[in-house]
Amino acid sequence: VGQNTGIRSRSVLSQTGSYKGIERMRQPLSRELSNLLERGRDRQLRLAVTGLSQAGKTAFLTSLVNQLRHAGVEAQLDLLPAAREGRLLGAQRLNQPDLGVPRFPYDPGMAALRDTPPRWPEPTRGISELRLQLRYRPARSGWLTPEIAHLTLDLFDYPGEWLLDLPLLQHDFYSWSQAQALHEGEQRRGLFSEWLTAVEQLDPAGEADEAQLAALAEEYAQGLRRAKKAGFSDLQPGRFLLPGELEGAPVLQFFPLPQLDASQHNTSRETLEALPANSLYATLAARFRYYQQQVVKPFYRDHFRRFDRQIVLVDVLGALNAGPERFEDLSSALRQLMHSFDYGQRSLLTRLFAPRIDRLAIAATKADHVTPD
């Protein structure tokens, strides 16, 4: 946040220990912007930012937008060569092309940082977008290079909980139930203890009871919310934490069956998949498939696969301070996320017809809490 905000941004940001973490994170982002500013063909960049477990993504985006808007005046963009050399002339907000996506709350975020005492911006609870047009002087001049060039920067903010849903596409209900580590780790087991006791008494072959399903799904969602508050990251399904317009819908009334054991005949995959449609197992499996097809895939298709670049902010220090169980949980979440990204340089055909993420940055915030020794 630049000096023009009316507050001393360095002291404000360092109060919670994230300023230097964001400062260090700006280096790879600055290199990326620098490369784009010097390229002759790419004039648009779609950058998505998300974070795990309150890593500070909304504050980061608010600060980034403010710095770019005041480039050449009071911004602190020393890691961006175009700004350091005086060639970045500034940025202005433009109307976003997709009117169906909420605008990123930049102004409320700045108002929070200017408040007395300063406050962190409110976290967003859905996807939002903000479009900037950057004006700059190219480093090299020529008869094909204009004196003043422009880069359109589309910034997207979306909840990390939604990102954690993408690994669900690799599972069916049976394998997802087995993958849930609800029995592992004393702290996590304690957060789901009552739900585990109740769900382990269920008969997967028994007839589904809608009232019972709704009650157990809500109890499972409460366990996820407790786990999020305790700092856990590997939490699925993500929409149970931020249901939005789906709150109360049957699509969110399912849960894993951690008691499934392929070595036992009565809970083997073959036995359970042969059960009638009104059985508990078949009902939960059907809702899991619906969630994959109607909730997760549309987000992946309509938004995620159109991003060019992705930044994932992670509070590694918080996980380290919380002990081995929390740290392993964060590691597990990151391992799963790696399978959700498409890699590779963008060819012309790819850029025109199938945009995808070809650059991913995973950044640890709160780096200033780590001493030099």
How would you name each of these model-derived features?
Residues S14-E38:
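N-terminal pre-Walker A segment at the start of P-loop NTPase domains
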Residues L29-L36, G40-R41, Q67-R356:
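Switch- and interface-adjacent substructures of P-loop NTPase systems
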Residues R43-R46:
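Pre-Walker A (Motif I) flank of P-loop NTPase domains
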Residues V49:
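Hydrophobic anchor at the beta1->P-loop junction of P-loop NTPases
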Residues F60-L61:
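Post-Walker A alpha-helix
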Residues H369-D373:
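GTPase G-domain guanine-specificity segment
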